[in-house]
Amino acid sequence: MKVDINAIKELRDLTGAGVGDCKDALTSCNGDIEKAKTYLREQGIAKAYKKSNKDVSDGLVAICIDGNKGAILEVNSETDFVARNEKFQKLVLNLAFLANQYGIENIEDFLKCEYANNTNINDEIMSNIAVIGENIHLNKIGCLSVSSGVVCGYIHNPIVDNLGKVGAIVALESNCDVEKLKIFARQIAMHIVATKPEALSLDVLDQNVIDKERDIIKKQVEQLNKPASVLEKIIDGRMAKFYQEVVLMNQMFIMDSQFTVSELIKKKEEELGSSINIVDYKLFIINK
């Protein structure tokens, strides 16, 4: 049958599939656009599963913030070329929005959630794999919320708003002025992206990380031929410096190196007249 060029254009606009694929679909479905959409979806998903085992080494990080809750996620692609594809970017931003709406960090559970028009998130990703032509992998999700306070985020060198290669969200609990708290929270998020801490506070830093670093330092100072009591003080001093590098609350604040983050919070509490607590943060870096 002869396929109407306008039908091909409409189907292409609806699905993002190529002209040839749209023509084949309409031919197979006797010009019925709805059936052709289903046909393309079935064919596309079959192609997508073949692509879904390819390595992914690029991608984007997206954030979505809504007052006292926020989400961050990392979606991987095979190449930077696709990471700069407008359709891929729209997908990633939509996924961040849904992650914030659902508040689900578990990937398997999130993929089962509704996307739109009775499709689930996994189906939408597979559909995009078929259209874009590269594997797409949802790598991780982070969600934060507070009952009183704010969640803020920061993307370094954004490609478009809320989308880039490195990003962070942080949750601050406080009863102080919300707008002033937002400014401070964004500064903390920027600090996190710049310094890349491994833990919020010393009490949640992995004990294995602590033990490994202490063992390394111990072996380094053994060669100094000092009394044991002196060596122990040297070890403690170097460990304190290590904590200042990897623990957020112990780090020197990048915008005012006179203060650690912990000291700055106390200063802000006095300034804003209310206690401030960093509940948690999430830092995502492509392929790290």
Swiss-Prot record:
Chain segments carrying region Involved in Mg(2+) ion dislocation from EF-Tu: 79-82
Subcellular location: Cytoplasm
Keywords assigned by UniProt, alphabetized: Cytoplasm, Elongation factor, Protein biosynthesis
InterPro entries: EF-Ts_dimer_sf, Transl_elong_EFTs/EF1B, Transl_elong_EFTs/EF1B_dimer, Transl_elong_Ts_CS, UBA-like_sf
Protein name, as recorded: Elongation factor Ts
Species of provenance: Ehrlichia ruminantium (strain Welgevonden)
Function: Associates with the EF-Tu.GDP complex and induces the exchange of GDP to GTP. It remains bound to the aminoacyl-tRNA.EF-Tu.GTP complex up to the GTP hydrolysis stage on the ribosome.
Family note: Belongs to the EF-Ts family.
PROSITE patterns xref list: EF_TS_2
CDD domains recorded: UBA_EF-Ts (cd14275)
Primary subcellular site in the record, as a coarse category: cytoplasm
GO function terms (MF aspect): translation elongation factor activity
Pfam families, per the entry: EF_TS
GO cellular component annotations of the record: cytoplasm
NCBIfam families assigned: tsf
Keyword Membrane: no
